[in-house]
Amino acid sequence: MYQVLKKKKPEVYALGQHISMSADKARRVIDQIRGRSYEETLMILELMPYRAGYPIFKLVYSAAANASYTMASNEANLVISKAEVNEGTTVKKFKPRARGRSYPIKRTTCHITIVLKDISLDDSESIELNLLKKPRWKKNSTAMAYYDLHNRGGLWDKK
């Protein structure tokens, strides 16, 4: 079975790298918006009291701008299909302390990926072509074999 796909891809993404925030704090916000529509996501992010809401809001807005530019799609048809947060690099500093000692400070960063999908461009628009194929010979070494363990004595034939 062969598929002829349209040139338009139904997904666009926005990637934010090296955002100075813990990945766990960003995941708390990302889990609330995953799978929701674009307009509903913007309302949720505007009212959320967390600091992670603003960078994620900017990424969702940027992904919607990418969708309207590349696919000429309407914002009402966009849904967040995938949203993930990965840990980024850790910035390590030293803070001077008493008696000439130093104290390490670790600033964590994260990478956030937002993928928007246009639900008006669905997979049902792809055309499937079933072409007749010549039957090919199967190799015996790679073919799957069925072993009947019950009639051949099974695993417990020796004691």
Swiss-Prot record:
Record-given protein name: Large ribosomal subunit protein uL22c
> Subunit comment for this entry?
Part of the 50S ribosomal subunit.
Question: Which Pfam families does UniProt cross-reference here?
Answer: Ribosomal_L22
Q: Which domain of life is it from?
A: Eukaryota
Q: Which family does it belong to?
A: Belongs to the universal ribosomal protein uL22 family.
First-listed, main subcellular location of the protein, grouped into a coarse class = plastid
What's a BP term from Gene Ontology annotated to this protein? translation
| Cellular compartments per GO CC | chloroplast; large ribosomal subunit
Q: Where in the cell is it found?
A: Plastid, Chloroplast
Source organism of this protein record:
Ipomoea purpurea (Common morning glory)
